[in-house]
Amino acid sequence: MAHKKAGGSTRNGRDSESKRLGVKRYGGQVVSAGEIIVRQRGTKFHAGVNAGMGKDHTIFAKETGRVKFEVKGPLNRKYVVIEPVA
């Protein structure tokens, strides 16, 4: 009778679900208060004027306005600023 040896097992075959990180609203776009601008791990972007940071480092708008990305300070940090719409 024909026999076939058992195939080996593997310890691979798993992957985590993607977290959908990144910039959600770009420079020049108008956002309303509470809207998420950037989802990130760590502080790639910092919260500037009229922007807040959640406990998972999400940057969100505190006021309705136009999104602006700025680089400033001695460490050349990237800030997200919301300029009020007149």
From Swiss-Prot:
Q: Where is this region: Disordered?
A: 1-24
Q: What superkingdom heads the lineage?
A: Bacteria
List the molecular function annotations (GO) for this entry: structural constituent of ribosome
Note the SUPFAM superfamilies from the entry.
Ribosomal L27 protein-like (SSF110324)
Does the UniProt entry include the keyword Ribonucleoprotein? Answer: yes
Q: Which GO terms describe its cellular component?
A: cytosolic large ribosomal subunit
| Pfam families named in the record | Ribosomal_L27
Q: Which InterPro entries match?
A: Ribosomal_bL27, Ribosomal_bL27_CS
Q: Does the keyword Transferase apply?
A: no
Q: Of which family is this protein a member?
A: Belongs to the bacterial ribosomal protein bL27 family.
The name on file for this protein is Large ribosomal subunit protein bL27
Q: Gene encoding it?
A: rpmA
